[in-house]
Amino acid sequence: MSVDSLREVGERIAARRRARRLTQTGLATASHVSYATVRAVERGARRPSDEVLEALAAALAVDATQLRTGYVGTERRVHQALPALSAVIAGYDIPQGPPTRGHAELAVAVDEVVDWRLGAQYGRIATEVPALLCDVIRYVHTARAAEQQTAARMLVATARAGDAIAFKYREHDLSARLIDLMRWAADRAADPLVQAAAAYVRTEIFFAARAHAVGLAALEQAIHAAPAPSSRSAAAARGALHMRAAVIAGRGGDANGADTHLTHARQLGDQVAREGVYLGTTFGPDSVRIHEMSVAVSLGSNHVDRALRVATEWMPPASLPAERRSGFYIELARAQEWANLPGDAFESLKAARAAAPQHTREHPWAREVTSSLRRFHRADAESLSHFAHWIGAV
């Protein structure tokens, strides 16, 4: 169910078109949608079908959720891609011939899917990552000796993008296989920082199984194996592992362990000094603040004051990747619902959706909070009902 009027959708498409310096004719040509349809959609006279919306979004280099807030076709696109993704990695260790793209073209495509993952643009990942992963696996097996480390790093990044959709859409077996591929490629890269990134992502397996104690042990093992934080990238790798360890310790009810790891993460965030993306993981002082919220919420409703205090003192800047910001607002909404602040909780959920619609729609806590608000609170009932239909909480 769309929460936008036809006029709002049309204005959004027109604004994106102008930002890319396209005429309506140019957009029609690029999207393979008729000029009459583009013109009618932009003036709010016609509702675009899912196929038309996706074609326009692809031509404008955005995800369809950025054109229509209530768009739910991403789930269909992801589920259509998952069998192909599974098939691609079935024999990743077996050479299958050369890739269809050269090194430079692959490098650009890999950087693009990393950006999409950080921006929670799962529909775009689903469209591109099966074929890209196939090519990068082939590149790993055929690259010259001097390119082997680069090829392995590219495979780690691409498999991680595939894992993003598998994990977010609760295909945990496929997610675990992709993480195994990441670890295999990280070993081929023979780079401790790449291995640290793979260990960071591996924690998803433990989250999914609720195996918090062994997950914490695995992260602490990875921290001990990580290089000394003598450079910004090494400090970021170690700091990200400490952030992850703090959250899984919190999920396991280990408040002291969570605080210890959070302290280490904070120190390393201060050392890094500025927020950045390091081997596909966002780290810096702002990410540490977001994980302060994560830890407080992970520890449970008895720590709600701690969670609310984080939000009183700090809010995520727009410069942070969309998935990070969305996660913060979802966790804040959970704390606000615990604190009997339903209006604030709903505002936080809407902020999460504005930051990353696909991430919010697939987040179990966002659905849980929405369902609770709808059952027990009547404020803004019509708007909340629209939101609940969109997120699948009805």
Set out the residue ranges of the language-model regions.
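A detector for short, charged/polar N-terminal pre-domain segments
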Residues: M1-E8
